[in-house]
């Protein structure tokens, strides 16, 4: 048997006797044979190599919504759009020599969403919802083989302001988001506020609601870097990107953490 480039593989992982975690369907795009010993390495990607998803395109969208743009691209590639998307008006947005997935990721991130393609699904995840969910597991220092955690004030802001003047009506739209970091996070032991900086967001908005969403999303996106780190531990299938964990007995860095990237190696 020899797999063909473009064939698909369905991957599940976990422990014998336990429920397996479905990792989705992958398209084979590279096969490598090496020796000694005889080893065959099969590499694949989550999006089909036969799809036009990676073709760069330039075009504009006018008088539409984020959900409509996502739906249009999903239909173009015969994907099922999964996830709840707020009714966000967009006067105009331009795709500049970008792949459809790259463009959607850029656009969605401005409004607080993450985008990925899994098999035949285009999945939108609301980041604020992910941050508010319950942790899937508690971890103590003895559960972890190695860890590195960092607490910083770099790229941390007290507020974010969006300001845009509509060319059609000359109306100035301004919105300021405040309180993106907790008071306990903003203070040092001496009681000093660690960041009083304001984030200026230069972005086109269609109305006050879209300005609010962009300001809140930009503030949350920057301030999530205040505390970040990495953990290495024995394989745990439920620890996937988008889930939360709770660190226990890690001192001031204890508490809930959102998983942004997970790598499982065998």
Predicted region positions:
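Extracytoplasmic
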Residues: 4-8, 21-23, 37-39, 76, ...
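Short beta-strand-centered interaction patches in the first periplasmic/extracellular domains
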Residues: 39-48, 85-149, 153
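Short, compositionally biased
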Residues: 25-34, 59, 128-131, 258-266
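An acidic/polar, Gly/Ser/Thr-rich interaction patch typically located in mid-to-C-terminal regions
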Residues: 1-4, 144-266
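Assembly/oligomerization scaffold segments
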Residues: 1-49
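Short acidic/polar beta-strand-loop edge motifs in secreted extracellular
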Residues: 50-72, 82-106, 110, 233-235
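Glycine-rich, acidic and aromatic/proline-enriched surface loops and short helix-turn segments
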Residues: 34-37, 64-82, 206-208
